[in-house]
């Protein structure tokens, strides 16, 4: 289960839960922790790709006029 469902305060920004999970995935990945690389370098290598896509889809759904009726994806 995603961590943003656990008792956390909502910061009021769109897709904030996915943003937190994406950030946590990058910062806890072996690429950053053990190898000492920057998170941006790990993204280029393809780590946490599913979280990146989910966050992108959530942000993109904010621009979709149909989502006003359906709600944002990922929330």
Swiss-Prot record:
It comes from the Eukaryota. Residues 28-66 form the CHCH domain. This is Cytochrome c oxidase assembly factor 5. Disulfide bonds join 31-58, 42-48. InterPro entries: Cyt_c_oxidase_assmbl_Pet191. A motif (Cx10C motif) lies at residues 31-42. Involved in an early step of the mitochondrial complex IV assembly process. GO terms for biological process: mitochondrial cytochrome c oxidase assembly. The gene is coa5. Keywords: Disulfide bond. A motif (Cx9C motif) lies at residues 48-58. Belongs to the PET191 family. GO terms for cellular component: mitochondrion. PANTHER family: CYTOCHROME C OXIDASE ASSEMBLY FACTOR 5. The keyword Disulfide bond applies.
């Amino acid at each position: 289960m995603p961590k943003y469902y656990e008792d956390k305060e909502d910061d009021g920004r769109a897709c904030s839960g996915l943003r937190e999970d994406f950030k946590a995935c990058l910062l806890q990945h072996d690429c950053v922790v053990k190898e000492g690389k920057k998170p941006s370098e790990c993204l280029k290598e393809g780590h946490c790709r599913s979280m990146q896509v989910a966050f992108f889809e959530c942000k993109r759904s904010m621009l979709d006029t149909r989502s006003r009726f359906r709600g944002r994806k990922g929330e």
